[in-house]
């Protein structure tokens, strides 16, 4: 930091914001702030925030010399921005023959203001949430119900929340795909078969700001089912209960994915193992198939970490977890076999960094029900 300029070296996903906020803090023009972007490491949306940049700028200004600011893991766990907690409420109506004909999905939680959205102008528009399609996973519900409605109720959180890998999709897709399974059970229909029926006639759903190609979702569902061996029974043994679950989603209009999870649960419900996750993918023209496989594997590890142990506890307004010793993430000895199958499309290539995250939790939860008859309606998964 100099009298009339500033140079920053930083791993950031938002260099423009870093430049503008540093300039505002120092009272100098934005063009007098040079931001050099280093290798990012794991960003996952956290580095869209620039709080750590401003900390370095303030210290550098006070010190009057170049400084390097490093956060410990403890700092990172306690002073980061957390994935927003949400509540999802769903209802469905069946006709006399057991066919689903009505759907209601209400979602409640912090909105995208964590990204600087919506703008002040958008906030004055009473139709903003429907017109701009928030939250994801609710407004772009692919299933074909004769009558359906969705609503999003934004609330302020006392906890600082921020972007998370797949942003708003995970909670809404977990609720939606779990509830479709509940409808299947109530209708005495195979969960995969019900999804295929609800996606007929395989048309394109035009939502004005996005389009959902149901035929592409049908294709990945059928591929995932075929590669996983659905609906053949899994092996059973004396001490464990085995089950298989399915979930699917469209990510940001241009990526279609279906997953089948295979799990086993000890009969005393104290030990859950995820043995295999099969993914079928259509993200248009796949320019880097190996990259898609790698992103699928990392997304599954991310989704499993969140589904099985991703929890922050607060006491006196302070996060209690301080390291990976008490914040549990997936370990290698618990990692499942991952299989990724690609449908090579001709559409424009779609981004795939987050696509495989939202379906992991519902696929596992639905597999748990298949094995034990117990529904999972809360994350992280717990039998207590």
Walk through the language-model features, giving the residues of each.
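Cofactor-binding beta-sheet edge motifs in enzyme active sites
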Residues: 1-384
